[in-house]
């Protein structure tokens, strides 16, 4: 395999990929708007509920929506009463805008660059509309606090996109009070500021 790193955002990278596909006749496996990718990511939902069968809710980052789509389908298939909350950064609320018919600005850089997606998926948008209970937006300061808390309290190094679930819990503790809650914490792809 030939790995090429190109672009600061997913959108910039996708523009480069489209050019390469035209030039070289390559096949695109979409990173989130693909049924097989969503199906694979659903195994995380199964693992959550096999490990902790009495979960009341899951809090999942949203970029293009593949991860939360797979997890939501799997989790609600096992436990239809489980609540699924999606988390986006206030700087990139693309899926939030789509589902809530809002026009919040999508702009700037974010510490949660792993979920900095300007255009949500069509397949994922439909799934999220049917399976996700709500989307919570978190700001940069809230994400930074979550990253710090994860490191200081648990010695977990998480990138911004991986810490947004914890940011949502810290932002809205009353929403999750008394609930068995799970979140995905991932990625050590973070630079010191």
Model-derived features: positions:
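PLP-dependent amino-acid enzyme catalytic core
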Residues: 1-193
